[in-house]
């Protein structure tokens, strides 16, 4: 049973992530449970700047940016699960394993980002992420993020 659910709109996402256009890849958070999971949305628009070159006549959302969107969702879950960081600390993307791409993501798609907390040890947290479009898996990966002083 979900006991601590919430919706975070873009204004709240901007408070949690340092990313900004054109690299902010989470539009809103549909729900989450602290220390457990988070579900977010990325609305894929033809106006995304990378579609001009990836690929002309057959625009496909770059796989590395699907992974980045999942990593940003992971960062939000980490922030919401642990509360405030110490001054000068950030969560940094630390590792990715077993990334698999199952279907292309195209303009007009709505990508659902599901990330799940697996475990945390000494400031390093492991997560599993899945991106879906129309309930079809587009990508899955295991990820880690680390709480560290700002560089």
From Swiss-Prot:
Active-site residue list: 54
Predominant location category: cytoplasm
GO cellular component, one term: membrane
Root EC class: lyase
Single GO BP term: lipid A biosynthetic process
Keywords tagged on the record: Cytoplasm, Lipid A biosynthesis, Lipid biosynthesis, Lipid metabolism, Lyase
GO molecular function terms attached to this record: (3R)-hydroxyacyl-[acyl-carrier-protein] dehydratase activity
Source domain of life: Bacteria
Reactions catalysed: a (3R)-hydroxyacyl-[ACP] = a (2E)-enoyl-[ACP] + H2O
Enzyme Commission designation: 4.2.1.59
Localisation: Cytoplasm
PANTHER family hit by this protein: 3-HYDROXYACYL-[ACYL-CARRIER-PROTEIN] DEHYDRATASE
NCBIfam families: fabZ (TIGR01750), PRK00006.1 (NF000582)
Family classification: Belongs to the thioester dehydratase family. FabZ subfamily.
Record's protein name: 3-hydroxyacyl-[acyl-carrier-protein] dehydratase FabZ
Organism phylogeny: Bacteria, Pseudomonadati, Pseudomonadota, Gammaproteobacteria, Enterobacterales
């Amino acid at each position: 049973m979900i006991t601590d659910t919430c919706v975070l709109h873009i204004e709240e996402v901007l408070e949690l992530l340092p990313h900004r256009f054109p690299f902010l890849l989470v539009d809103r958070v549909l729900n989450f449970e602290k220390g457990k999971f988070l579900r977010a949305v990325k609305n894929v628009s033809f106006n995304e700047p990378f579609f001009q070159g990836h690929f002309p006549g057959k625009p496909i959302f770059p796989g590395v940016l699907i992974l980045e969107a999942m990593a940003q969702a992971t960062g939000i879950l980490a922030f919401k699960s642990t509360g405030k960081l110490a001054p000068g600390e950030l969560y940094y993307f630390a590792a990715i394993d077993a990334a698999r791409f199952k279907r292309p993501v195209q303009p007009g798609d709505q990508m659902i980002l599901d990330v799940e907390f697996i475990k945390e040890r000494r400031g390093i947290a492991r997560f599993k992420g899945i991106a879906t479009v129309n309930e079809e898996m587009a990508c899955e990966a295991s990820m880690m993020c680390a709480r560290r002083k700002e560089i």
